[in-house]
Amino acid sequence: MSAKDERAREILRGFKLNWMNLRDAETGKILWQGTEDLSVPGVEHEARVPKKILKCKAVSRELNFSSTEQMEKFRLEQKVYFKGQCLEEWFFEFGFVIPNSTNTWQSLIEAAPESQMMPASVLTGNVIIETKFFDDDLLVSTSRVRLFYV
């Protein structure tokens, strides 16, 4: 195992996604929240989100995470897949993470134009969000969450 692989394993071992919520960015109203650690690799997670989230112009996502390890440049790359085809790609950067810290990170996700939106009945169960967790260029973990619109 290379030093980079070992470093990625150390970071992952000490990393936990404590909770997450999604809000309507205009009203601040929480639309979904969960406490499952959606960062755990190797399993397909599931999330049931209200269909009205698809009507929001923008969604505010709040993540609360803990890390025992220092990270120089913590960031996420997310891809939204519909039936295996990548529809959207998002990039988020948190930056420096203090070792043995718990942090809350808020990000804004802008919706696709309404003309490009598919109905919840078509999307439900067919959308997977793949999240890659990085420390700068070091891939720490890849997780997948299948979305169901309820």
Swiss-Prot record:
Give the matching InterPro entries: Ig_E-set, PDED_dom, PDED_dom_sf, Rhodop-sen_GMP-Pdiesterase_dsu
- Which Gene3D superfamilies does the record cross-reference, listed alphabetically? GMP phosphodiesterase, delta subunit
Among the GO molecular function terms of this UniProt record, one is: small GTPase binding
Keywords on record: Cell projection, cGMP, Ciliopathy, Cytoplasm, Cytoplasmic vesicle, Cytoskeleton, Joubert syndrome, Membrane, Sensory transduction, Vision
Look up the record and give one Gene Ontology term from the biological process aspect: visual perception
Q: Which GO terms describe its cellular component?
A: cilium; cytoplasm; cytoplasmic vesicle; cytoplasmic vesicle membrane; cytoskeleton; cytosol; intracellular membrane-bounded organelle
Q: How does it sit in the bilayer? A: Peripheral membrane protein
Q: Where in the cell is it found?
A: Cytoplasm, Cytosol; Cytoplasmic vesicle membrane; Cytoplasm, Cytoskeleton, Cilium basal body
UniProt note on tissues of expression? Widely expressed. Detected in various tissues including spleen, prostate gland, testis, ovary, small intestine, colon, retina, and peripheral blood.
Residues covered by region (Required for association with membranes): 144-150
Q: Name one Pfam family in it.
A: GMP_PDE_delta
Its biological purpose is as follows: Promotes the release of prenylated target proteins from cellular membranes. Modulates the activity of prenylated or palmitoylated Ras family members by regulating their subcellular location. Required for normal ciliary targeting of farnesylated target proteins, such as INPP5E. Required for RAB28 localization to the cone cell outer segments in the retina. Modulates the subcellular location of target proteins by acting as a GTP specific dissociation inhibitor (GDI). Increases the affinity of ARL3 for GTP by several orders of magnitude.
Give the protein family: Belongs to the PDE6D/unc-119 family.
Please give the clinical condition linked to this protein: Joubert syndrome 22: A disorder presenting with cerebellar ataxia, oculomotor apraxia, hypotonia, neonatal breathing abnormalities and psychomotor delay. Neuroradiologically, it is characterized by cerebellar vermian hypoplasia/aplasia, thickened and reoriented superior cerebellar peduncles, and an abnormally large interpeduncular fossa, giving the appearance of a molar tooth on transaxial slices (molar tooth sign). Additional variable features include retinal dystrophy, renal disease, liver fibrosis, and polydactyly.
How does this polypeptide assemble, per the annotation? Answer: Interacts with the prenylated catalytic subunits of PDE6, an oligomer composed of two catalytic chains (PDE6A and PDE6B) and two inhibitory chains (gamma); has no effect on enzyme activity but promotes the release of the prenylated enzyme from cell membrane. Interacts with prenylated GRK1 and GRK7. Interacts with prenylated Ras family members, including RAP2A and RAP2C. Interacts with prenylated RHEB and NRAS. Interacts with prenylated HRAS and KRAS. Interacts with RAB13 (prenylated form); dissociates RAB13 from membranes. Interacts with prenylated INPP5E.
The protein in question is named Retinal rod rhodopsin-sensitive cGMP 3',5'-cyclic phosphodiesterase subunit delta
